[in-house]
UniProtKB/Swiss-Prot annotation:
It holds the Pfam family PTS_EIIA_1. Keywords: Cell membrane, Kinase, Membrane, Phosphotransferase system, Sugar transport, Transferase, Transmembrane, Transmembrane helix, Transport. InterPro entries: Dup_hybrid_motif, Glu_permease_IIB, PTrfase_EIIB_Cys, PTS_EIIA_1_perm, PTS_EIIC, PTS_EIIC_1, PTS_Glucose_EIICBA, PTS_IIB_1. Residues 560-664 form the PTS EIIA type-1 domain. The chain crosses the membrane at residues 12-32, 81-101, 137-157, 182-202, 223-243, 284-304, 315-335, 340-360, 364-384, 395-415. Its EC number is 2.7.1.-. This is PTS system glucoside-specific EIICBA component. It comes from the Bacteria. It is an enzyme of class 2 (transferase). Residues 438-519 form the PTS EIIB type-1 domain.
Length: 688
């Protein structure tokens, strides 16, 4: 039961990132619009009083605010899109369902606009009236206040309707309404039923949420911030942190703005107070990120670099510099956190506790800084320094310096004391268990506890996914010794990151379990092991050119933790602008994934490159891809390898960003050129 629940929570957490991703743009508009008529700034720059500038700032501020005012609707649409694989029909169904659900609740409970607004003493217009917290006016519909929870509920139901009925067949005379056209219709019926149920079920839930928020925010907010910081960081590896922080950011707490409207949620309240120009009382559940993201984690990265073996310092230095800089500037910490999460969990435990204290210290000091993207330097400028007099943002700097010192010395001590295998301190290559290509799936199956211990077997281009019967029978250390760069365990679900070999290992394991292939003889193993150095002893320099027309981005910006964390190797991200992927060098095609979304190439000097077209494109089952080459075919630099329907990928995949990584960089140096605009003739990387 837990395993199924975890899987569903992962999907929901990922779906919530779609509406959350809109908030940085809205927050920037709101922050800059508000800053342009900030009294202190206007005194310094009187030209901001110009009528045109005032109009522009007002438009920017209003444009940002309208997004925060309609978050429930955005969560409904975004959740449906995320859970239905990005299909627009599910989004339309969620929109229709959300409106119908709110209209139903309003009619069942006989809610009118007079029940929502009651004229306050001296109020002359509706906008000055006090608002009834239990009710809301949603897009002109008087209804029950369900907040973002209502949007998430309706979005999830719309996605369920889509997944259940998108391919339904109807009698010929109703054929027009068959398939996807049926989804909004059935969602409307479900929305009516949901509205009726929520009319009676939501008020006690609402009372419970209000009581919980009052307890957390009023009884002991100091302790609450500490616990919040610990749990939020603890859930990062499982991708469930989005679910955890959403109630705190979008529901808990309340504030009545200058227009008399009730605003709920720590993040939304902070934005409303920014617009009203009042002292900040919100921000307790965002401010704590700044010290450890901007200062603590980069210092931890330096400690990891310092403790790397001398011959590995150059490689580890590049990895830690890029990951630390990413954390400082943007607040994206996963590339750095995942570099030590698997190999040194004790360091992640230290990090989690320090993150909790960061939230605690910021609250005790009265620092209140909002956030939309993450707690990096960019958000710090927009929401902290531009409002330093109200946010007390300058205190982040001395606190951050203290956290940098603490992080550095604790990580340095723990790495040396416990002999942790952080990047650059891994066991020597000779200590890794030898396993030939033919024998590897047998060894992995044995490490997983044997075929009797396998409940479900799956894989993608980056990782082997196995659900086991008894986790105690799994030899995690053995799996890593066989070449997995990391093993993620959640309940009985194991994810072993073998890179491009994962799918082949899965197919071979399936054949072994069915009896189609048997274990190779010792003679076979010996022969294959003696052949392995052919691939390891790469000589010379390999120039790697762009795989097409587009943009080159750092690998740390690729929206996938396995690639961004460099678990499969180093390289770059490529954003294609034309639907043709070409060979980056002269070499041989070693692998074409069955679903055509990934290609493995080998240069004449033995450098192996993986081109993974888009993110999560394995789920497209080959749709949108046309392979122009075959395995073992010799190719020349610039030769077309794959035709890609970019429009289809943009509509059906999370991202078209294409990681291009070197998978056998051991004992080699990678030089990445300072290139942004790319075409097939432009050099982007060199392996020496």
């Amino acid at each position: 039961m837990f395993k199924k629940l975890f899987g569903q929570l992962q999907r929901i957490g990922k779906a919530l990132m779609l509406p959350v991703a809109i908030l940085p743009a809205a927050g920037i508009l709101l922050a800059f619009g508000n800053a342009m008529h900030n009294e202190q700034l206007v005194e310094i720059a009187p030209w901001l009083k110009n009528d045109i500038i005032v109009m522009i700032s007002s438009v920017m501020e209003a444009s940002g605010q309208v997004v925060f005012d309609n978050l429930p609707l955005l969560f409904a649409v975004g959740t449906a899109l995320g859970l239905a694989g990005g299909d627009g029909v599910a989004a339309l169904a969620a929109l229709v369902g959300y409106l119908i659900m709110n209209a139903t609740m309003g009619k069942v409970l006989h809610i009118t606009i007079d029940d929502i607004f009651s004229y306050a003493k001296g109020a002359k217009e509706l906008s000055q009236a006090a608002k009834e917290p239990a009710h809301a006016l949603v897009l002109g519909i008087p209804t029950l206040q369900t907040g973002v929870f209502g949007g998430i509920i309706m979005g999830a139901l719309a996605a369920w309707c889509y997944n259940k009925f998108y391919n339904i067949t109807l009698p010929p005379f109703l054929g027009f309404f068959a398939g996807k056209r049926f989804v909004p219709i059935v969602t409307s019926v479900v929305a009516i039923a949901t509205g009726v149920v929520l009319s009676f079920a939501w008020p006690p839930i609402q009372d419970g949420l209000n009581s919980l928020s009052n307890f957390l925010l009023n009884k002991n907010l100091t302790l609450t911030t500490f616990i919040f910081g610990i749990i939020e960081r603890s859930l990062i590896p499982f991708g469930l942190h989005h679910i955890f922080y959403s109630p705190f950011w979008f529901e808990f707490g309340s504030y009545t703005n200058h227009a008399g409207e009730l605003v709920r949620g720590d993040q939304r309240i902070w934005m409303a107070q920014l617009r009203d120009g009042v002292p900040f009382t919100a921000g307790a559940f965002t401010t704590g990120k700044y010290p450890f993201m901007m200062f603590g984690l980069p210092a931890a990265a330096f400690a990891i670099y310092k403790n790397a073996r001398p011959e590995r310092k150059k490689v580890v230095g590049g990895l830690m510099l890029s990951a630390g800089l990413t954390a400082f500037l943007t607040g994206i910490t996963e590339p750095l956190e995942f570099s030590f999460l698997f190999v040194a969990p004790v360091l992640y435990g230290i990090h989690v506790l320090l993150a909790g204290t960061s939230f605690l210290v910021m609250h005790l000091l009265g620092v209140k800084i909002g956030m939309t993207f993450s707690g990096g330097f960019i958000d710090y400028i927009l929401y902290g320094l531009l409002n330093w007099d109200r946010s007390h943002a300058l205190l982040v700097i001395p606190v951050g310096i203290v956290y940098a010192i603490v992080y550095y010395f604790l990580f340095d001590f723990a790495i040396r004391k416990f002999k942790l295998k952080t990047p650059g301190r891994e066991d020597e290559e000779t200590e890794i268990r030898n396993s030939s290509v033919a024998k590897l799936p047998f060894d992995v199956l044995d490490a997983m506890g044997g075929k009797e211990n396998i409940k479900h077997l799956d894989a993608c281009i980056t990782r082997l996914r196995v659900e086991v019967v008894d986790k105690s029978k799994v030899d995690v250390a053995g799996i890593k010794a066989l070449g997995a760069s990391g093993v993620l365990e959640v309940g009985n679900n194991m994810q072993a990151i073998f890179g491009p070999k994962s799918d082949q290992i899965k197919h071979d394991m399936a054949k072994i379990m069915s009896g189609e292939i048997t274990k190779p003889s010792e003679t076979t193993v010996t022969e294959e092991m003696s052949d392995e150095p052919v691939h390891v002893e790469a000589l010379g320099t390999t120039d790697i050119y762009a795989p097409g027309v587009g943009q080159i981005i750092p690998l740390s910006e690729v929206p996938d933790q396995v690639f961004a964390g460099k678990m499969m190797g180093d390289g770059v991200g490529f954003i294609p602008e034309k639907g043709e992927i070409v060979a980056p060098f002269d070499g041989t095609v070693k692998t074409i994934f069955p679903t055509k979304h990934a290609i493995g190439l080998e240069s004449g000097s033995g450098v192996e490159v993986l081109i993974h077209i888009g993110i999560d494109t394995v789920k497209l089952n080959g749709e949108g891809f046309e392979s122009l080459i075959n395995v073992d075919e010799k190719v020349t630099q610039g030769q077309p390898l794959m035709k890609v329907n970019l429009a289809y990928l943009k509509a059906h995949a999370p991202s078209i960003v294409t990681p291009m990584i070197i998978t056998n960089l051991e004992n080699k140096e990678l030089v990445i050129e300072d290139v942004q605009d790319a075409d097939p003739g432009k050099l982007i990387m060199t392996v020496k």
